[in-house]
Amino acid sequence: MFPVPANLQRLADQIDGWLDLRCPDRALALLAPMLADANGRAAGLVLRVRANVRLGEFAAALPDLAELRTLAPAEGWVDLTEAFCRKRLGDLPSAITCLEGMLARDIKSDIGHFNLGCYLALTGERDRAIDEVTLACGLNPECRDFARDDPDLDSLRNDARFRVLLRQAPADAAGNPGPLDDDEDDDDEPPPTGPRDHHRRN
């Protein structure tokens, strides 16, 4: 996502390891050299965001995400993670705005459509929510499995359109791909922070 200078790679790997071990406090304690290095700061900010998200310090992650946005305005990970943080802080309108902005740039992000559908469902916008989850399932059939279990979508479960969506196979009997699935490669990787809700397939 953001390059790590060679002289900081070992430290970055160590910090990443602590995050993988679910020890974000240990990761935070090691970040100062990366944040102080002009070439390593962006990668350091990503790691600090991941640590704060793991700790549940969602408000603390927002300034770092804002700085990352100035460095890489089109980076979808920033939008997805900010949306997650704002949702956890109870600001669903801002979370939805983040995802809408990301999808305006990358309409083929399955996780973007799926998470937007979840957030819309929580606000009571059922029709839009079903539309977004349908798009996500067309881009990535695995999203149908996530939709079956995701509590954010509970308000949709009595809707006939949603029930039909969950019963559909990813391809029809003739082997045609689902809607919007116009290539064979799935190049939409989930963010590395952990959320899906945030990130239901992380």
Feature-to-residue mapping (PLM):
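"A position-specific structural signal for the A-helix of alpha-solenoid helical repeats
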Residues: 13, 47, 81, 115, ...
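Alpha-helical adaptor scaffolds
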Residues: 43-111, 118-122
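Alpha-helical segment of the N-proximal tetratricopeptide repeat
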Residues: 4-56
